[in-house]
Amino acid sequence: MSLDLSTSLSPARPLESADAMEERLREIGAARYHDRHPFHHMLHGGELTKGQVQAWALNRYYYQCTIPVKDAVVISRFRDRATRIEWRHRLEDHDGAEGAEGGIDRWLILTDGLGLDRAYVESTDGILPATRFAVEAYVHFVRDRSPLEAIASCLTELFAPNIHATRISGMLSHYDFINPTVMAYFQRRLTQAPRDADYALRYVRDHARTPEERAAVCNALIFKTQVLWTQLDALHHAYVLGHVPPGAFVPEEMR
């Protein structure tokens, strides 16, 4: 597959306003978001085997189940009660609440539907080392960098609805083992992600007040795109090129 990964990012320039920062953020998303990755093109275009889709869902589970951990860390960074209250709904979006299904539950419906043993998925024993390292790096980032950068790292949600819509239509049309029930996670995120992105964007526009702070916001988004891209690089290396590391999940057709 030939994929043009050239970018149209503007030359480095001081970010003198919130509008200039937002323009830069959107340029970063257009150039670096993981919808451009070859593995996603294969996934959405029906080019993967069921085993390769299983490997993707299994590894992505580690990211999904760590998101509320990351969000709990973000909450812990703020003395401002209003910010904590706003961010708290993200925990329930993923963890769920008493009597209410969350995103992790919906992801497990996907892995169940793909024929993966739930206990094995939840153990995370079969994930790739790069998956674990990338996801843990994200948690460490929001713990160790400024609260502003912690929120900015979530701005990939600005670009998520498009990839979710593409994934829903592409996977439903190309794979006979995919149905609307197992795609419920992505359907829900079509409404959740824009709400979350709108808040995060407002926050960084209001609180990044110097060119240096605005540059830090942009670099936080770049870091997050690298976290996502690294996971797909690892999946492609292991399950498309066939270099599965010891201890990782091996699809039936590769055994």
From Swiss-Prot:
GO terms for molecular function: pyrroloquinoline-quinone synthase activity. It comes from the Bacteria. GO terms for biological process: pyrroloquinoline quinone biosynthetic process; sulfur compound metabolic process. PANTHER family: 4-AMINOBENZOATE SYNTHASE (PTHR40279:SF3), PQQC-LIKE PROTEIN (PTHR40279). This is Pyrroloquinoline-quinone synthase. Keywords: Oxidoreductase, PQQ biosynthesis. It comes from Cereibacter sphaeroides (strain ATCC 17029 / ATH 2.4.9). Pathway: Cofactor biosynthesis; pyrroloquinoline quinone biosynthesis. The keyword S-adenosyl-L-methionine does not apply. Ring cyclization and eight-electron oxidation of 3a-(2-amino-2-carboxyethyl)-4,5-dioxo-4,5,6,7,8,9-hexahydroquinoline-7,9-dicarboxylic-acid to PQQ. It is an enzyme of class 1 (oxidoreductase). It catalyses: 6-(2-amino-2-carboxyethyl)-7,8-dioxo-1,2,3,4,7,8-hexahydroquinoline-2,4-dicarboxylate + 3 O2 = pyrroloquinoline quinone + 2 H2O2 + 2 H2O + H(+). Belongs to the PqqC family. Its EC number is 1.3.3.11. The keyword Ribosomal protein does not apply. HAMAP family: PQQ_syn_PqqC (MF_00654).
